[in-house]
């Protein structure tokens, strides 16, 4: 058995379903070994697409997504998606080929120090310098990637090592996969948290992506409902509590004084559950550092002058909340009701005006929500549309609106939708993207066609980098190099064999969405959007009292 065969056997042992990547010269042995494997290799049109697919697979499944590249340019192309997974706390294992050991001491074709490059965007990385260490290296890569806080790991496999025969029998078997245990909180931590929360007059819960990773959303709902404490979610925490719930404060994350931010201004105790600074810094919701913070998570709190923890309760999030909640009485329901009413009123006012042309972001969101069921999946690319979707797209369940908010790399939308559809073929999948993000990885439309994946790509077109235009206008009152032209997006889609649609008036979007969702193949919708609403939103939020 060759080392490449052992590598594939170890990946199978970890339960790998899909391997996203590109074949190359230095990974020939690995590609050949995959022919005899149950792992499905998904050939992408760019390594960045492969890394984004592994990234979103990890977010949705909780299991490490795996991506593969050759050396040199293949490895550098993976880098952005790997970094995105690492900051979005998505478990991912990247495997890159490398030059043979006998040419690493000198200048060599396509050889670069890949280990050093990946070190800064992963939790752990290593070179497989001998076939015998493959079982240990693979097991550690998956264990580290999937352990809180999850993220990316990287393995480098030199070409000559991949082709070597594995020697002794004891080195030719994968290591046993051990499931993580659920750590229980310490009694003293729980008791102190109960004291702090019991003394609160205006408590609020800030729930982050750690809740979803820990499959603890039901525990958050129980805790909030039993105690009448309102819940705000981070962008990556959407769906922890249904937005239709009377305790939902929607999402906190816009770097402006949005409606939920006013609740945090009045709150005296913030119960931060699975909250991650990488999404939304504490200085935005605790500018004076004077809130009493109860930190509930598997991991200790990060150090921050605006996040002075009164008590940290460390352990499995669901166990922590259930134990804290068991010793508390309900808060005043009037506080929670007033918080919710103020936010709902604000959003209703935004939706009150009749649809205009081009469509306003709020109305695109309303039509999209109406077209989808609660369990369908939306993958949101990065741009101005992300801010609108995070604020206003209602979710009933976790992992139904995936937003990249750590590294926040543009271009994740189309590859992410492919991963979501492969993982959940029975659910409808829509990517919401801007014309900037779409063209960064639009080549993966061919991958979707080849795999026969019926998914919808809703392109909010404004012929520019909308969120940067918004910020330039706010800061300088003018713009700089943010405008561009686009191809005919309908013809572009059709050139791949996909369906192409164009919205030409506000009343068409609902029927176009229905047609695209039911066409049975990948579809692209060109939807012009009026982003003058961005500045109007800023002015509206400034006027809040």
Where are these regions (language model features)?
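Conformationally flexible catalytic loops at phosphate/diphosphate-handling active centers
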Residues: 140, 144-199, 348-351
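Thiamine diphosphate
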Residues: 95, 103-110, 303-314, 318-324, ...
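Glycine-rich, anion-gripping cofactor-binding loops and their flanking helix/strand elements
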Residues: 39, 59, 209-294, 396-426, ...
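Glycine-rich phosphate/diphosphate-binding loops that line cofactor/substrate pockets in enzymes
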Residues: 6-16, 56-61, 86, 144-149, ...
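Phosphate/pyrophosphate-binding active-site segments
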Residues: 132, 168-169, 289-386, 506-515, ...
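A short, small-residue-rich loop immediately preceding and capping a beta-strand
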Residues: 17-20, 40-42, 60-99, 206-209, ...
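Active-site diphosphate/adenylate-binding microenvironment
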Residues: 7, 12, 27-31, 35, ...
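Glycine-rich, acidic loop regions that bind phosphate or pyrophosphate groups
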Residues: 96-137, 237-339, 487, 513
